[in-house]
């Protein structure tokens, strides 16, 4: 086992603080509408330019192991805030830096670190309550656009597109962000349920120009096993022909004779038909087939339930106003399912989302909710160069996360003002001793740090701005760094999601509290230069001629 280097007391804390400051100083230049970019070196390709706090934090590794430990702990603040709220990583980093810096000063002055931490926790809980009380629901898509714009560093176009997408797919809809090949940023919305399985044979195509199969007022047969022969289905197919409606078969697979028979019937014009594979795999496939059944008012023909193809009747088939099938995707629009049943299914999937511990499962379950309840929108981000597209995509991702958070827990005044106003709730709060009171004072001072940083990035004196806002009785009064004006932040459209601000403070206080109470640090000793590698052979001389 390698020898360890151990640091204690002031030496350990100073090294740790240096690491915290190095990382936080690199991240905080991105804060606010006039925040700057950070350029990140890539091992291959062009450097990446970003204003996303967590992307900057993730790139930083320091040479000194003790400093690096401090930096990594603050990186954890940014990562946790990003995971929980999806935005607010820079705010969280600035708060953590301020709490750690002030806290370590007090520890150096002889105060008890544990009592300081208790005071910090006490103050944080009080401020979080105040933030929750200040939050108000998002009224309309204009406010959604404002939240998106602020999070995208003042680019109104991004905010507007996210608001449009959310309006179209609803709060339950899924919005994904992709890179676009062109210059423009555009939004595509898919209404109805779409899944990534296309037609099994190009002979099913009805629109030769677009190479799509389009079925209007269509019947849908859902079968969870493979279809290799149509013999058991003949009575059903005869009824379908009499009804003169098109039929879509969704099954695990349709192969061999069954597929050939369907194609021949389609070409002869006797039967308007198409077949696609069922989406998903294993248990997820069963669940998705059941979703389609509920959406279209049909039943899944499943051997688990003792159903056979021979006994399928017309009332077991689902129906939909329109179905469009390309070679890669199937879209079912306006299924005939009962609204109450669809809502019950959505509630059931939501309960599974609450219980699951896997991020992958959660994402897939949320997609299923969106397909049943809302729809799916794709924002394709464009730009002149690849570097610009990646930088804009970072901002669109942040803005999207911020708008989702705003819909969940409401909005508060932005620009760091809410934290300063919430800090007024600490007046009169006292701990059980003077050291805890010092912890409360640390949080009160730290709450001004994001506001000061936003002002300083805009080239204005942060202390003056913080003083003006502190003195104001109006809770919405703040400083708009974009226009450098004072006034009502709601009327300026400078608003933040309550969830983002709350999460940033909770995560910053949690990890800063751990750093303040650190008394010793242990790291591997660096290997001495020129030391022989362990286990090497003493002499390999005289073997130079061997190839």
From Swiss-Prot:
Listed InterPro entries: Chaperonin_Cpn60_CS, Cpn60/GroEL, Cpn60/GroEL/TCP-1, GroEL-like_apical_dom_sf, GROEL-like_equatorial_sf, TCP-1-like_intermed_sf
GO biological-process terms attached to the record: protein refolding
Chain residues that bind ATP: 30-33, 51, 87-91, 415, 496
CDD domains named among the record's database cross-references: GroEL (cd03344)
Region feature Disordered, mapped onto this chain: 528-547
Origin superkingdom: Bacteria
Homology family: Belongs to the chaperonin (HSP60) family.
GO CC list: cytoplasm
UniProt enzyme class: isomerase
UniProt EC number: 5.6.1.7
Taxonomic source organism: Ruegeria sp. (strain TM1040)
Subunit (UniProt): Forms a cylinder of 14 subunits composed of two heptameric rings stacked back-to-back. Interacts with the co-chaperonin GroES.
Subcellular location: Cytoplasm
GO molecular function per UniProt: ATP binding; ATP-dependent protein folding chaperone; isomerase activity; unfolded protein binding
Protein's name in the database: Chaperonin GroEL
Disulfide bonds: none
Pfam families reported for this sequence: Cpn60_TCP1 (PF00118)
Biased composition (Gly residues): 538-547
Gene3D superfamilies xref list: GroEL (3.50.7.10), GroEL-like equatorial domain (1.10.560.10), TCP-1-like chaperonin intermediate domain (3.30.260.10)
Its job: Together with its co-chaperonin GroES, plays an essential role in assisting protein folding. The GroEL-GroES system forms a nano-cage that allows encapsulation of the non-native substrate proteins and provides a physical environment optimized to promote and accelerate protein folding.
Swiss-Prot/TrEMBL keywords: ATP-binding, Chaperone, Cytoplasm, Isomerase, Nucleotide-binding
Reaction(s) the record says it catalyses: ATP + H2O + a folded polypeptide = ADP + phosphate + an unfolded polypeptide
């Amino acid at each position: 086992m390698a020898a360890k280097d151990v640091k204690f007391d002031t030496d350990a804390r100073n090294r740790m603080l240096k690491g915290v400051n190095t990382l936080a100083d690199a991240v905080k230049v991105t804060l606010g509408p006039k925040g700057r970019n950070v350029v990140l070196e890539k091992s291959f390709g062009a450097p990446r330019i970003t204003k996303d706090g967590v992307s900057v934090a993730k790139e930083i590794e320091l040479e000194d192991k003790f400093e690096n430990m401090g930096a990594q702990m603050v990186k954890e603040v940014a990562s946790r805030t990003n995971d929980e709220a999806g935005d607010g990583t820079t705010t969280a980093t600035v708060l953590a830096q301020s709490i750690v810096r002030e806290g370590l000063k007090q520890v150096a002055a002889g105060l008890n670190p544990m009592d300081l931490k208790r005071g910090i926790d006490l103050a944080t809980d009080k401020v979080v309550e105040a933030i929750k009380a200040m939050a108000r629901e998002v009224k309309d898509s204009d406010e959604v656009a404002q939240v998106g714009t602020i999070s995208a560093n003042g680019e109104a176009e991004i905010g507007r597109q996210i608001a449009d997408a959310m309006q179209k797919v609803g709060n339950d809809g899924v919005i994904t962000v992709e890179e676009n090949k062109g210059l423009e940023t555009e939004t595509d919305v898919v209404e109805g349920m779409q899944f990534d399985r296309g037609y099994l044979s190009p002979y099913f195509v009805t629109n030769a120009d677009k190479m799509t199969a389009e079925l209007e007022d269509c019947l849908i047969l859902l079968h969870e096993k493979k279809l290799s022969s149509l013999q058991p289905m003949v009575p059903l197919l005869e009824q379908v022909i009499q009804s003169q409606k098109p039929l879509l078969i969704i099954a695990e697979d349709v192969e061999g004779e069954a597929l050939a028979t369907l194609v021949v019937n389609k070409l002869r014009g006797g039967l308007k038909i198409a077949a696609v594979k069922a989406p998903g795999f294993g248990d997820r496939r069963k669940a998705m087939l059941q979703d389609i059944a509920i959406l279209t008012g049909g039943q899944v023909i499943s051997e688990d339930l003792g159903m056979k193809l021979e006994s399928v009747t017309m009332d077991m088939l689902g129906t939909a106003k329109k179905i469009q099938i390309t070679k890669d995707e199937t879209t079912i629009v306006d299924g005939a399912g009962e609204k109450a049943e669809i809502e019950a299914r959505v509630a059931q999937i939501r309960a599974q989302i609450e219980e699951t511990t896997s991020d992958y499962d959660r994402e897939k379950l949320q997609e299923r909710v969106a397909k049943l309840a809302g729809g799916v929108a794709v924002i394709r981000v464009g730009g002149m160069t690849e570097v610009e597209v990646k930088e804009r995509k970072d901002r669109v991702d942040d803005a999207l996360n911020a708008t989702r958070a705003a819909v969940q827990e409401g909005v508060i005044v932005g620009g760091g003002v809410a934290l300063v106003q919430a800090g007024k709730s600490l007046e009169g709060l006292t701990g059980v001793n003077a050291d805890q009171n010092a912890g409360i004072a640390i949080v009160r001072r730290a709450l001004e740090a994001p506001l000061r940083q936003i002002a300083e990035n805009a080239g204005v004196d942060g202390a003056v701005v913080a003083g003006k806002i502190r003195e104001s009785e109006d809770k919405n009064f703040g400083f708009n760094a974009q226009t450098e004006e004072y006034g009502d932040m709601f009327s300026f459209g400078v608003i933040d999601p309550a969830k983002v601000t709350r999460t940033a403070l909770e995560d910053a206080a949690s990890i800063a509290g751990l750093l303040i109470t650190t008394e010793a640090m242990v790291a591997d000793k660096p290997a001495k230069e020129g030391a022989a590698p362990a286990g090497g052979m003493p002499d390999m001389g005289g073997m130079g001629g061997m190839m």
